[in-house]
């Protein structure tokens, strides 16, 4: 301890590195009895035997997968020598430093696994106070194990330690003495005590210093991997000096009593199972203490065993320890059997214990029996050992006798007392007595926490003893552990039969002593698999039961059991269990502590454990189902996977948790990106096929993660579970408490039935998706691989098409979806998963994801690239897929339309929707399932409807493509996303799916409304199509901007883990939805998928109930949707038709398909028109109809022309910079604004540009989709896109330029927000949102308003914008991309990452140049409203002509013709910019309305307006999103342009009116409304500011006012948005422009990326904030700056905080000074809540409710120090002088550096500020007044004035000045 921490750390690092090199890849422990394989890989002999015994026939090398046989194993003496030397070094290190190397090592490892968590723990837990605090918590919580665990977990970051802590802390009074004794490590007694105490306690202590939480984890890890090191160090440190002979004796004892040792291990194990639950249940506090002591002893013993395993040191240290522990072991040996028996009973009892908190009575006996036998034995042993330290072997008999004599708790206490006495009496006895007790207790506790872990230690000990009896011990221990774990689980499980079986097995295991175990290794292993199977079954139930009972604890047990199950191989299982326990314990604690858990999940260990745990639990289910198929193989596979993972495990070896975690880590790591690759690689044995599948389809990787399909199922579930497992485990435990209770028993059945269902479903899906595989995946090999991999996978693969996640989740489906029965459970899981995972993982994983995202994204991109390419081939099969999907959907649908459909689709879509559903379900079970249903329903609907049929095919194709794309991406991305990055890919996948699902969900919700019936067919198909397109684009964009978005979105989405991760869109949705609500999320998703749908629903829905949305989304959406649902539907229908067609066209859809699609689309347009016309939403509908009416022709022409044009545009856009031209201008703006997102913007711009090329093609689609995405814009887009299409068909440039304009705007927006696509989609989304409210205004105002109102909308929009930036861009881009070309997307996702990056960069440059040109044009037109608009019109037509003259011509020709028919006026405006200009001139109101008009004009002049709308929206959005320069510039430009272009806009309105006339009264109405609103726009403007402020409400209000149609339209159709928005928005926009400063400010605020600093938060809390910030695209900085917008303070429930520098600076700067609860509540509600409700109200010094922050924020124009000259003189503590000066400057004072610099004059009041207590000279500050004529006040005057934001009177702060003479 004397050594400098750095030096010690360096040495430790070196030792760690050496240790890592010498670790067994399987057990991640130092290699014991190293054996080498033919492939020259070194493993522990025991591990290899365990591996070889795990399955019959040749096993595979975990590292290289070469076949291994026992005969091929050769002992490697050189490694054993190295290990011995390393142990000696570690021992020496421990002795020299007084540090337990193993602990720190373990800690380091664990820290690596859960760095944040452990580090936090270390920093926090290293203090005894904290430990005591934890102890106190534990003691206070012990009655409620789960609560204890939870609280402890919460308190203790290292949840792994929590249990041990609880137990240990209960024991800690005793341990205190130990700790005290530990303090005297140097003395031999102390060393012995310390050995015992030190080893036991020091493990605890040092672990505790490292983190009480780490204690268990460390102990476990210590046991697992570092145990030998740590224990060796500790033991060596403490024990080696004391008893070297004892070491020998112990070794001998170990040799002699491997059984006993194992018995003790088993006992411990059994005690552990008993104790685990007992502990979890809070065995009696006495028992807990005893158990803790025993655990410690076990730990020590384990450590000793570890050391024993470890050659040299192990022997020397372990000789002593072995003697002690052998004595303990001997003591325990009988008790082992008894314990085994006892444990069998106690396990059952312990089940009850878990259920009963005071089960100690039962269990204590059993536990006591086990520990007791051990305790008595240990006492006797201690006595004997006391007499003969070296003859510990003899005392084994005593221990046996003692063990057999089951003492009672009192006895245990006595034993403990005796142990304490012995500890006091003799080191050896202390070691033994304490060791048995502590080892037992620790072990029990660990066993409780980590039954397997202790056993792993024992196993390790066994391994250590393996030289003599280590392998037998290990095997025995392993089996015991496995059995014990299983027993523990089964017991916990309430499956007493199994428990009995386990008991029998345990007895057998007990009977299997180390020697026996070697011989019976196969038996043990076989039994272990059986037990594993039983345990699996039990554990499945148990896991659920455990989840129910003790989420954390039982999860641990479950994890252990699961791990055992997963790792049939004893060693692997043991080590994995040990690691798993380490993780499982932390995990269970983690589960208890969701946030901590999240942190822990960030740590990756707990999460993985949890993942595995739940995976295991589910895994068991899956194993049950698959167990019959794959249970043993999965175990073997898992072991192989572990073996395979060994390299990873080696990596993870760092974390001793890694062993168990390894499987878990494999899964979890698969879940998590880094581990995913390696572990997947490592899992290749079983997962090789899976991996192939995975590679082809990441989902398979996800599935692979489980290690077997069974595992996959479980892993899927587990992952599904795991991600949510943190939160979900909590919730799920709660949810599952019921569900698991049911499912605990059902899981197998559910799994079985589920699997059968899945099989059936898969059969259905296979049949329906058998086409899909090919269709869905160009790479059918993936499917075959999947199919080859596992039935479930194969089934899943087909499902993959339907829902790749389904494959993943079909295993889950087997568990989750398959068991529709389980679906409740699944729902529970999914919900927790979606909610909790989204929420928890979002918090936790987000960090990990940020790190993992990049790699994972890369991986997913790689995968998705392949998959995307695979998707590329899908277009040919869309109809198949469509039909199949449709058939499947129909079959699903035919079943319970919603429930069955939900279920089947859930299962089917479970892959997709399950991810989605998880998030979606999280958002909306019904919605989620409807999403599922809808997902298939859309296809079904599409299929049902003629247009649905063709479009379905198209849609299906898109769907297939999208699904394929998304599915591959989803799986490529999602699978990994399911892992950590999978969140991101899941984002795209879920985004797609969730989008689709949410869209469809919304549609289902909508379809709940009339529109649902009408629109669902269309919408779902559209959704599917758009969804797919969007997904495709999302995938593309996700791929392209995946890193950016993923980092941003994924991070953000990670926040909403699944939801957000679920989809980029969902991220938006999640963010928006979190901000707005899940429904909004759905809508956002819809918006992304079908922004029109989304927007139509969103604008109305959003506008109406951005906040309501979540809760009222169904109602409101239904109402709003009812209002605009037709629009949605029509848009969707239209969009699916046009979009689908266009998308299909873009996406390589054959012309016939397009024609059919177009025809059908036209038909469907007619139908849609009819439907929509008939629909109440005739505005939207009519508008859509008008759009559509011409649209069918236009669409036909457009679709065909669009095909040509789009493809033309594609090539042209790639080369064309017409859009690029426009993009650059915005991009300049963007770059100005989005300088912080330049790479994104650039990349997105590039992507956008690239996408634009796609988008040009796709722009029709994507603009249709995007525009359609913007419901208004959708309609506008329809109109305008039909304009565009017609124009674009007429003039590709038109589309391009209109789209370009739009795209430019989009791009600008996209640039501002993301690629223009984001801008487009987001803009559109925002437009549609804003269109309900006025995009700019709504966005800005809405953002403002929302920020003010609830930040929901603001956040939604902001997030939406931000999310949308990433996700809208993703959505739009992806939409566009997908629309344009599924294959394009596929290739683009590849290309995006490579060529497109370059292309996009080039395009960006071009765009910038063109933007400059555009700006010049805009400026020219900016001088003239008409010209300005013409510039926009140029953008639309002029730009079409200018940018795409050739295209413009052709497009314009078509445009003209089509436009004439479609939008005569619109055509005129578009065709004739003059008209527009005239109109522009006509309405100057439009000026004010400009944004609105622009928005409305987009509605009116779709291409023109869309362009401009996009443009202005872009401006607005840009402004909104990035209120920075671009916003200002844009706002100014846009407003100028708007003002100048207001005429054009008005004309647009005018033109739009005719169009409306053409389209119908609603349009006229909306047009009139627009017009009347235009004129009203002034009044409206008046209310527009309101609207602007009310943002969504205006839209809603306007929508409600201009209502119904208007709302529908404003929400749905640009017209309404026009009318409403024009009235409201134009007004709003005008108000925006009028309020432009405010708007700018608010826009800046809203659009300006929020920047947060935190103050007073713990690392765990900071991590939550970090994840929250990532989720919501908020910049999180360490220091407060001018850009900072929010200061997050740690407050109490009354929002009272401590005063910190950031607090003062936040108030002085008028920042939002909000409570940390704002973050936590926002995370809980999955949306950014309004800061108003969480603003800090006071502080502990100035008052608890002085409202200073609010006063400051609202009084920035009234600076409190205005007119003051302040000199901050002299030293100041706690804050730099410059910060103090900045503070007073922010408050309006002028700062003077020197006293002599005061300005003498009137109006200026000098003040000198000093801090007297900072002065070293007492009187120095008293003479300051002599140097200047200024009052001298204390710094408190400044601080109080700032805190209260009221200039305080100087009197009370004046410092009396001493006369100069005194000075």
Swiss-Prot record:
Modified residues (Phosphoserine): 114, 395, 398, 423, 434, 551, 694, 708, 725, 753, 840, 988, 1009, 1143, 1189, 1191, 1211, 1217-1218, 1280, 1328, 1336, 1342, 1387, 1423, 1457, 1524, 1542
Keywords: Acetylation, Activator, Cell cycle, Chromosome, Cytoplasm, DNA damage, DNA recombination, DNA repair, DNA-binding, Fatty acid biosynthesis, Fatty acid metabolism, Isopeptide bond, Lipid biosynthesis, Lipid metabolism, Metal-binding, Nucleus, Phosphoprotein, Repeat, Transcription, Transcription regulation, Transferase, Tumor suppressor, Ubl conjugation, Ubl conjugation pathway, Zinc, Zinc-finger
Cell compartments where the protein resides: Nucleus; Chromosome; Cytoplasm
Location of region: Interaction with PALB2: 1397-1424
A GO CC term attached to the entry: BRCA1-A complex
UniProt GO MF annotations: DNA binding; RNA polymerase binding; transcription coactivator activity; tubulin binding; ubiquitin-protein transferase activity; zinc ion binding
Metal-binding as UniProt keyword: yes
Stored Pfam families: BRCT (PF00533), BRCT_assoc (PF12820), zf-C3HC4 (PF00097)
Subunit structure: Heterodimer with BARD1. Part of the BRCA1-associated genome surveillance complex (BASC), which contains BRCA1, MSH2, MSH6, MLH1, ATM, BLM, PMS2 and the MRE11-RAD50-NBN protein (MRN) complex. This association could be a dynamic process changing throughout the cell cycle and within subnuclear domains. Component of the BRCA1-A complex, at least composed of BRCA1, BARD1, UIMC1/RAP80, ABRAXAS1, BRCC3/BRCC36, BABAM2 and BABAM1/NBA1. Interacts (via the BRCT domains) with ABRAXAS1 (phosphorylated form); this is important for recruitment to sites of DNA damage.
Name the UniProt record assigns to this protein: Breast cancer type 1 susceptibility protein homolog
């Amino acid at each position: 301890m004397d050594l400098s921490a750095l030096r010690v750390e360096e040495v430790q690092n070196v030792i760690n590195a050496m240790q890592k090199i010498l670790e067994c890849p399987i057990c991640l422990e130092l290699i014991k009895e190293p054996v080498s394989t033919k492939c020259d890989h070194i493993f522990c002999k025991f591990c290899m035997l365990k591996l070889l015994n795990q399955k019959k026939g040749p096993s595979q090398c975990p590292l290289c997968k070469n076949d291994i046989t026992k005969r091929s194993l050769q002992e490697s003496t050189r490694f054993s020598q190295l290990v011995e030397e390393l142990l000696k070094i570690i021992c020496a290190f421990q002795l020299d430093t007084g540090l337990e190397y193993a602990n720190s090592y373990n800690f380091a490892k664990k820290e690596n696994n859960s760095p944040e968590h452990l580090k936090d723990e270390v920093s926090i837990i290293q203090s005894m106070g904290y430990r005591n605090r934890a102890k106190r918590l534990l003691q206070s919580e012990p009655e409620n194990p789960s609560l204890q665990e939870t609280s402890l977990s919460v308190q203790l970051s290292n949840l792994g330690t929590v249990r041990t802590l609880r137990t240990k802390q209960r024991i800690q009074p005793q341990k205190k003495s130990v700790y005290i004794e530990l303090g005297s490590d140097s003395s031999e007694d102390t060393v012995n005590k310390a050995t015992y105490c030190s080893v036991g306690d020091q493990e605890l202590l040092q672990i505790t210093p490292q983190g009480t939480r780490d204690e268990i984890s460390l102990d476990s890890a210590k046991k697992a991997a570092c145990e030998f090191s740590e224990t060796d160090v500790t033991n060596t440190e403490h024990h080696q000096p004391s008893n070297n002979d004892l070491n020998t004796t112990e070794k001998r004892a170990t040799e002699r009593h491997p059984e006993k040792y194992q018995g003790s291990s088993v006992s411990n194990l059994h005690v552990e199972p008993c104790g685990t639950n007992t502990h979890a249940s809070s065995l009696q506090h006495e028992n807990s203490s005893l158990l803790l002591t025993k655990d410690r002893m076990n730990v020590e013993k384990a450590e000793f065993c570890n050391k024993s395993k470890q050659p040299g040191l192990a022997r020397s240290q372990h000789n002593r320890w072995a003697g002690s522990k052998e004595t303990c072991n001997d003591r325990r040996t009988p008790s082992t059997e008894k314990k085994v028996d006892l444990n069998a009973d106690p396990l059952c009892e312990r089940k009850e214990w878990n259920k009963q908190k005071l089960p100690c009575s039962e269990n204590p006996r059993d536990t006591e029996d086990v520990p007791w036998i051990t305790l008595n034995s240990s006492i006797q042993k201690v006595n004997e050992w006391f007499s003969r330290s070296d003859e510990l072997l003899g005392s084994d008999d005593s221990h046996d006798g003692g063990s057999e004599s089951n003492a009672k708790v009192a006895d245990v206490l006595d034993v403990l007392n005796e142990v304490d006495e012995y500890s006091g009496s003799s080191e050896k006895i202390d070691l033994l007595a304490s060791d048995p007790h502590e080892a037992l207790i620790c072990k029990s506790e660990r066993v409780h926490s980590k039954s397997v872990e202790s056993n792993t230690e024992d196993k390790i000990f066994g391994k250590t003893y393996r030289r003599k009896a280590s392998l037998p011990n290990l095997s025995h221990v392993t089996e015991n552990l496995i059995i014990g774990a299983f027993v523990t689980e089964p017991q916990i499980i309430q499956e007493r039969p199994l428990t009995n079986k386990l008991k029998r097995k345990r007895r057998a295991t007990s009977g299997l002593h180390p020697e026996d175990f070697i011989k019976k290794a196969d038996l043990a292993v076989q039994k272990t698999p059986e037990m594993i199977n039983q345990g699996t079954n039990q554990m499945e139930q148990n896991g659920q039961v455990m989840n129910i009972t003790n989420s954390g604890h039982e999860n641990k047990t479950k994890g252990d059991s699961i791990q055992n199950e997963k790792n049939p191989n004893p060693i692997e299982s043991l080590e994995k269990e040990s690691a798993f326990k380490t993780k499982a314990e932390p995990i269970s604690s983690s589960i208890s502590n969701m946030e901590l858990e999240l942190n822990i999940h960030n740590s990756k260990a707990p999460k993985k454990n949890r993942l595995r745990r739940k995976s295991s639990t589910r895994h068991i289910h899956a194993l049950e189902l698959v167990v019959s198929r794959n249970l043993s193989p999965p175990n073997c596979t898992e072991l192989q996977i572990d073996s395979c993972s060994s390299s990873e495990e080696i990596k993870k070896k760092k974390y001793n948790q890694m062993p168990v975690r390894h499987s878990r880590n494999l899964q979890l790591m698969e879940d998590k990106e880094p581990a995913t690759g390696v572990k997947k690689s490592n899992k290749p044995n079983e997962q090789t096929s899976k991996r192939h599948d995975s590679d082809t389809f990441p989902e398979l990787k996800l599935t692979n993660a489980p290690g077997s399909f069974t595992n996959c199922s479980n892993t899927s579930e587990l992952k599904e579970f795991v991600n949510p497992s943190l939160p979900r485990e909590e919730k799920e435990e709660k949810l599952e408490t019921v569900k698991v209770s049911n499912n605990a028993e059902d899981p197998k059945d559910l799994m079985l039935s589920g699997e059968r269902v899945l099989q059936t479903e898969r059969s259905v899906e296979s049949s329906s998706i058998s086409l899909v595989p090919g269709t869905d995946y160009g790479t059918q090999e993936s499917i075959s691989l999947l199919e080859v991999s596992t039935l479930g996978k194969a089934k899943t693969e087909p499902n993959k098409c339907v829902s790749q996640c389904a494959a993943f989740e079909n295993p889950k489906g087997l568990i989750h979806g398959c068991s529709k029965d389980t679906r409740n459970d699944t729902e529970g899981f999914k919900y927790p998963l979606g909610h909790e995972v989204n929420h928890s993982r979002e918090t936790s994983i987000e960090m990990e994801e940020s790190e993992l995202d990049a790699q994972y994204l890369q991986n997913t991109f790689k995968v998705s690239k392949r998959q995307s390419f695979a998707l590329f081939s899908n277009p040919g099969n869309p109809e198949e897929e469509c039909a199949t999907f449709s058939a499947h959907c129909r079959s699903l649908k035919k079943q319970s339309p919603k429930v069955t459909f939900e279920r089947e689709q859930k299962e089917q879509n479970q892959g997709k929707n399950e991810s989605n559903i998880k998030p979606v379900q999280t958002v909306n079970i019904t919605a989620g399932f409807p999403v599922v249903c809808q997902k298939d329903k859309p296809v079904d609907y599409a299929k049902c409807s003629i247009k649905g049929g063709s479009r379905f095919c198209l849609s299906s194709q898109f769907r297939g493509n999208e699904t394929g794309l998304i599915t591959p991406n989803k799986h490529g991305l999602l699978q990994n996303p399911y892992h950590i990055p999978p969140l991101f890919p899941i984002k795209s996948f879920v985004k797609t799916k969730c989008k689709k699902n949410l869209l469809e969900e919304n549609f289902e919700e909508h379809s709940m409304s009339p529109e649902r019936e009408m629109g669902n067919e269309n919408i779902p198909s559209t959704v599917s199509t758009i969804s797919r397109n969007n997904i495709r684009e999302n995938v593309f964009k996700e791929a392209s901007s995946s890193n950016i978005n993923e980092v941003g979105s994924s991070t953000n989405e990670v926040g909403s883990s699944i939801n957000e991760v679920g989809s980029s869109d969902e991220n938006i949705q999640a963010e928006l939805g979190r901000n707005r609500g899940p429904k909004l999320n759905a809508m956002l998703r819809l918006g992304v998928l079908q922004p029109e749908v989304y927007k139509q629903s969103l604008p109305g829905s959003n506008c109406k109930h951005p906040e309501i949305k979540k809760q009222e989304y169904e109602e409101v959406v239904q109402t709003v949707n009812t209002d605009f649902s037709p629009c949605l539907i029509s848009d969707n229908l239209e969009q699916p038709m046009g979009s689908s067609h266009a998308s299909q066209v873009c996406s390589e859809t054959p012309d016939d398909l397009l024609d059919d699609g177009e025809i059908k689309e036209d038909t469907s347009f007619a139908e849609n028109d009819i439907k929509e016309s008939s629909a109440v939403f005739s505005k939207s509908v009519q508008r859509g109809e008008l759009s559509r009416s011409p649209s069918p022709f236009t669409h036909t022409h457009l679709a065909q022309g669009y095909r040509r044009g789009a493809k033309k545009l594609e090539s042209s856009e790639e080369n064309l910079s017409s859009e690029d031209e426009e993009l650059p201008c915005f991009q300049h703006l963007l770059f100005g604004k989005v300088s912080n997102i330049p790479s994104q913007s650039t990349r997105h711009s590039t992507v956008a540009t690239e996408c634009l090329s796609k988008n040009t093609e796709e722009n029709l689609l994507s603009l249709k989709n995007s525009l359609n995405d913007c419901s208004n814009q959708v309609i506008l887009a329809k109109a305008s896109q039909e304009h565009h299409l017609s124009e674009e068909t007429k003039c590709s440039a038109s589309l391009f330029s209109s789209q370009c304009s739009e795209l430019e705007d989009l791009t600008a927006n996209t640039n501002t927000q993301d690629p223009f696509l984001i801008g487009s989609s987001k803009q559109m989304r925002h437009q549609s949102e804003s269109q309900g409210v006025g995009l700019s205004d709504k966005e800005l105002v809405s953002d403002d308003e929302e920020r003010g109102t609830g930040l929901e909308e603001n956040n939604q929009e902001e997030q939406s914008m931000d999310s949308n930036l990433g996700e809208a861009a993703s959505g739009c881009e992806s939409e566009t991309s997908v629309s344009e070309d599924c294959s394009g997307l596929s290739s683009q996702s590849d290309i995006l990452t490579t060529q497109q990056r370059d292309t996009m960069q080039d395009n960006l440059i071009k765009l910038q140049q063109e933007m400059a040109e555009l700006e010049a044009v805009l400026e020219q037109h900016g001088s003239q409203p008409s010209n300005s608009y013409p510039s926009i019109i140029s953008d639309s037509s002029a730009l079409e002509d200018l940018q795409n003259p050739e295209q413009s011509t052709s497009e314009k020709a078509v445009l003209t013709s089509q436009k004439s028919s479609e939008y005569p006026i619109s055509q005129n405006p578009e065709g004739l910019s003059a008209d527009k200009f005239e109109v522009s001139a006509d309405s100057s109101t439009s000026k004010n309305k400009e944004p609105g008009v622009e928005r409305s004009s987009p509605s009116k002049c779709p291409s023109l307006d869309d362009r401009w709308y996009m443009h202005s929206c872009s401006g607005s959005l840009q402004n909104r999103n990035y209120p920075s320069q671009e916003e200002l510039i844009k706002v100014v430009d846009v407003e100028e342009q708007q003002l100048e272009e207001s005429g054009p806009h008005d004309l647009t309105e005018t033109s739009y009116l005719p169009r409306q006339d053409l389209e119908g009264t609603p349009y006229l109405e909306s047009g009139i409304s627009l017009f009347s609103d235009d004129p009203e726009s002034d009044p409206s403007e008046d209310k527009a500011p309101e609207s602007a402020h009310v943002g969504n409400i205006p839209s809603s209000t306007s929508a409600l006012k201009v209502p119904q149609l208007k709302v529908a339209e404003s929400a749905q159709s640009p017209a309404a948005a026009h009318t409403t928005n024009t009235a409201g928005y134009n007004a709003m926009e005008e108000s925006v422009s009028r309020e432009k400063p405010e708007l700018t400010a608010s826009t800046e605020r809203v659009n300006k990326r929020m920047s947060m600093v935190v103050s007073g938060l713990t690392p765990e809390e900071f991590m939550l904030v970090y994840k929250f910030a990532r989720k919501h695209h908020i910049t999180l900085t360490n220091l407060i700056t001018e850009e900072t917008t929010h200061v997050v303070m740690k407050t109490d429930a009354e929002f009272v905080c401590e005063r910190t520098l950031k607090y003062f600076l936040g108030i002085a700067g008028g920042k939002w000074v909000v409570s940390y609860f704002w973050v936590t509540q926002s995370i809980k509600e999955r949306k950014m809540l309004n800061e108003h409700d969480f603003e800090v109200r006071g502080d502990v010094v100035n008052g608890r409710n002085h409202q200073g922050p609010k006063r400051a924020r609202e009084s920035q124009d009234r600076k409190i120090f205005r007119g003051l000259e302040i000199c901050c003189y002299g030293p100041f503590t706690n804050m730099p002088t410059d910060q103090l000066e900045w503070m007073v400057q922010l408050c309006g004072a002028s700062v003077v550096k020197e006293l002599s610099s005061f300005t003498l004059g009137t109006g200026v009041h000098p003040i000198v500020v000093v801090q007297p207590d900072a002065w070293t000279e007492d009187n120095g500050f008293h003479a300051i007044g002599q140097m200047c004529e200024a009052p001298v006040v204390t710094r408190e005057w400044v601080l109080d004035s700032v805190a209260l934001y009221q200039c305080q009177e100087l009197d009370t702060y004046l410092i009396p000045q001493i006369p100069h003479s005194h000075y």
